[in-house]
Amino acid sequence: MKTLERTDPVAEYSAARASAVVIPRSHEGRVRAVGRDRLDLLQRMSTNDLTAMEAGEARLTVLTTPLARIVDLLWVLNLGERVLCLTSPGRVAVVRRWLAGYIFYNDQVKFEDASNDLGQLGLYGPRAGAVANAMVEGAAALVENRFLERDGALVLRGRPLAGDGFTIIASAAQIETLREQAIAAGATPAGEEAFQMLRLAAGWPYGDHELTDAYIPLEANLWPAVSFSKGCYIGQEIIARMESRGKLARRLSGLRLDGLVAEGSEVRAGETMAGTVTSVGTLPGLGPVALAYLKTALARPGTSVTVGETRGVVVDLPFV
C-alpha cells in the first residue's frame, strides 16, 4: 500500500500523467437544492439546458449576470428528489445569494450549504477509472457526465484530466477512508499544487483566476456548458448575439514563456495591449506557461508577445 505521505508536485503531476492520483477537493463548494422547482430555477438562471436531465446525470452550466458575466461555473447533478451543485472554492455564499435573489413567491426551492456535511476527492489520470472501480463497483463503466451512488459514496465521471477524471463525494466522516482506499488501489496521493499544474496543462479556467465577472463564458472556452437552443435565462441575449455574430472580444489562450511572470500582468503584442495573464505555472517538458485572456485578433497561435521583460508566444490549448 502507498503511504499517505505526499511526494512533491512535479512527481505528483508525473504520476497523474502515467497512472492516477487522488487529490482532496473538499475546499470546493457543494450546494444542495431541494423543492419542486429546483431544476426549473437553475434552468432559467444558467447557460446549459437542464430540463431533460435524467437522475444520475450531471451537466456543466454557468450562472451569469444580466450582462452575461460569469458568477460561477457549476456541476449540476440530478439525484432525483434533489440536486447537488458543485461550485468553485469560496463561491457557495455567492451562488446561494445569487440564486435566492431570483426565487419568485410561488417557487418551491431551497438552496442549502452542504459543504461541511460532504467531502470531495478528485481522481485523475489514465488509471483513474480502475481506481474508482476498486472503490465503488461499477464506476469504470460510467460514461462522461454520469454518476452512481453506492454505499454512501457518489462517483461522477467528469471532464478528463491527464486522461480521465472522477469526482468522489461522500460524508465528511467517510471521505478520508475513501482516500485511503484510492491509495490502496494504486493512486498516488497529491495536493493542490499538482492539481493546478494539471488543470493549467489542460487549459481549464478555474475559480478566481479565470471564472470572474470580468469575463463571459464563451471567452473562457466554456462552449460545452452553453446551450444555444434553450429558452431565456439571465444573460442569454448577449451570449446568443456573440455566438451568432461570431465575434468575441477576447479569448482564453495559452502562452509559452521564457520565464515566470505575475498573475494579473499585462500581455503586449508589440506596442499593443493584448490582454491579461490569469494563471501561471511551470510544466515538466514545457517550462513556464500561462493562461491569459487575449484580444481575439491577437490570440492566434504563433503570435509573439511580451509580459513585462519576458518574451512569449501564443499557443493552442491544451498545453498537453
Regions found by a protein language model. Give the residues of each.
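Acidic, proline/glycine-enriched N-terminal capping motif
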Residues: 1-71
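Short amphipathic beta-strand starts and helix->beta connectors
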Residues: 9-18, 61-73, 104-107, 147-156, ...
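Acidic, low-complexity central loop/insert segments
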Residues: 21-25, 30, 72-199, 205
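Residue-level signal for inorganic ion chemistry
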Residues: 35, 85, 123-125, 168, ...
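A generic structural motif
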Residues: 37, 80, 115, 127, ...
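Glycine-centered loop/turn motifs
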Residues: 55-58, 138-148, 203, 208, ...
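Glycine-rich, small/acidic residue-mixed loop/short-helix segments
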Residues: 69, 74, 215, 220-236, ...
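Anionic-ligand-binding alpha/beta catalytic cores of soluble enzymes and soluble regulatory domains
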Residues: 167-256
